């Protein structure tokens, strides 16, 4: 079973009963759970607080779970996100996965299935803790994640709403902190820490 004791989980659902059940289940395992009745409240917290896993319902008043997922990925590209869909709602599940969700969970929630998916998602956030241990900032981790997706400095700057010069500065500091001198070694170092699979040589050659 995963170690929940250091995990910070954000859970979004407009049904108070569901929020209570989920928060109690995860808190009994040691996780620190923050619950939100509206997606926009969660998004505000994401911009200023650490989150290791985001779990959100899809159909809610105001901002939907898919919209929250999209915005959350802009704030924290590395963040694993799980979405909760109605039973048999395949089109919605597909939309969520295309938007960047790691997995989906169907209602009504089955405890065994729910915890299995949550544990798998938390394993994805473990490399981030290791990178934070290397004193990387959240912005540097976001830049690194996008770099490992094959994004150029210009694309990263646009996605993170920063100047190209700022992104270049983040990349230089990240390389220095991880003890590497080029992009190829940076990718290898990140992979060794468990952040990502190594991209293809063609991807590395196109980095600018």
PLM regions with names:
Residues 3-18, 22-26, 54:
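Conserved acidic segment of CheY-like receiver
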Residues 60:
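Receiver (REC) domain active-site loop signature in two-component systems and cognate sites
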Residues 175-208:
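Basic, Lys/Arg-enriched C-terminal extension of HTH/homeodomain DNA-binding domains
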Residues 89-91, 105-118, 159:
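C-terminal output helix
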Residues 35-53, 74:
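Acidic, metal-coordinating helix/loop segments flanking the phosphotransfer/catalytic sites
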Residues 37-38, 64-67:
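Acidic catalytic/metal-coordinating carboxylates
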